[in-house]
């Protein structure tokens, strides 16, 4: 009997030990995880050069071609004249900065079915600053106070014998006509049909909406620098080809930009006068804005002969046009506003503040 008991103990003892070990709570705890370093690069797992611009406030100071003028509390006017470091050419640039955090001001989008000129908008609205707005109505989506005034009606942009596929609505400006202004790359990589569908949906909830192109800066990414690379030239002799329009020809430019600290920039660059202001491409304008103002968002608007800015107390003493519209540089220039005809005389003693073009849309700042 003793031998049998000893035998059973020898057989069962290892089993008891095994069971006891398995019942130990500490043995079921998994090993600690291997530490993982968080990736700061966002969804793509990458960082970008433009991320270094976040949190930086950049503004020009007086000197080096810049003149800085305080217009009112929260509104500053900048004028540059000289050789720009980006384009390596002579330029005249005009910028009005409005602090949207200041509740004393409203920023508004105006639409005139019979068109208007910036100086008349300035006087009729008692504005502090006015700037021309969007492209021709057939090329943009425009919603005013919830009513659609333009719906990208044209599939093509006609210029002489050329019909260029529509390209002027890749991005948009959304406003409440007070202090909420947003610049978004809404139509990025979309077809024309998708633009129409997307903006029609947006117009149901957005009170004021206007499209334009190209987007210049999208959350600090300088997308305007590569616009022409993404749009290879198709019609090299047509000024409405997007590559020609934005890249291979330098023109007067108008842009709207917004900084990370919620300041809005009206931007106009003169052009078509090589010895005074050559004009600028979309890529050059993008770099110029990054270097001098570091906006978080920026969008190109209608430029060329349309580019015009008025600022209170600046420029022409009667009209307050600060830049030098180029339409009357070579000959008299005639415009029509409704049933009225205006003839701007040809420049006789160098650039003047006349030659405004009549256009349908404007941005302006007013004091409440």
Explain the meaning of each model-derived region:
Residues 1-8:
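Bacterial N-terminal signal peptides that target proteins for export
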Residues 139-245:
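Active-site-adjacent helix-turn-beta-strand microarchitecture at beta-sheet edges
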């Amino acid at each position: 009997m003793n031998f049998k008991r000893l035998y059973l103990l020898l057989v069962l003892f290892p089993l008891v030990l095994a069971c006891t070990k398995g019942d130990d709570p500490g043995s079921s705890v998994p090993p600690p995880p291997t530490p993982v370093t968080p990736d700061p690069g966002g969804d793509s797992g990458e960082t970008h050069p433009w991320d270094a611009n976040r949190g930086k406030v950049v503004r020009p100071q007086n000197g080096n071609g810049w003149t800085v003028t305080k217009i009112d509390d929260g509104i500053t006017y900048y004028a540059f004249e000289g050789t720009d470091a980006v384009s390596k050419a002579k330029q005249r640039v005009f910028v009005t900065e409005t602090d949207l955090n200041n509740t004393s001001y409203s920023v508004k989008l105006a639409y005139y079915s019979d068109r208007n000129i910036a100086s008349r908008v300035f006087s009729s609205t008692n504005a502090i600053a006015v700037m021309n707005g969007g492209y021709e109505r057939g090329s943009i989506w425009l919603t005013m106070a919830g009513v659609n005034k333009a719906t990208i009606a044209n599939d093509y942009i006609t210029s002489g014998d050329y019909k260029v596929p529509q390209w002027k609505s890749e991005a948009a400006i959304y406003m409440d006509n007070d202090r909420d202004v947003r610049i978004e790359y809404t139509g990025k990589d979309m077809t024309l049909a998708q633009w129409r569908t997307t903006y029609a949906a947006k117009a149901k909830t957005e009170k004021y909406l206007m499209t334009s192109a190209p987007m210049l800066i999208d959350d600090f990414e300088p997308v305007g620098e590569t616009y022409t690379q993404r749009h290879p030239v198709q019609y090299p002799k047509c000024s409405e080809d997007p590559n020609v329009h934005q890249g291979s020809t330098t023109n007067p430019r108008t842009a709207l930009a917004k900084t990370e600290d919620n300041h809005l920039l009206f931007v106009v660059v003169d052009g078509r006068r090589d010895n005074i202001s050559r004009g600028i491409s979309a890529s050059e304008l993008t770099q110029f804005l990054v270097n001098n103002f570091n906006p978080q968002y920026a969008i190109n608007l209608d430029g060329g002969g349309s580019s015009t800015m008025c600022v209170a107390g600046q420029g022409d003493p009667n009209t307050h046009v600060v830049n030098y519209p180029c339409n009357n540089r070579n000959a008299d220039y005639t415009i029509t506003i409704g049933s009225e005809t205006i003839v701007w005389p040809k420049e006789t003693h160098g650039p003047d503040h006349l030659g405004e073009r009549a256009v349908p849309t404007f941005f302006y700042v007013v004091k409440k």
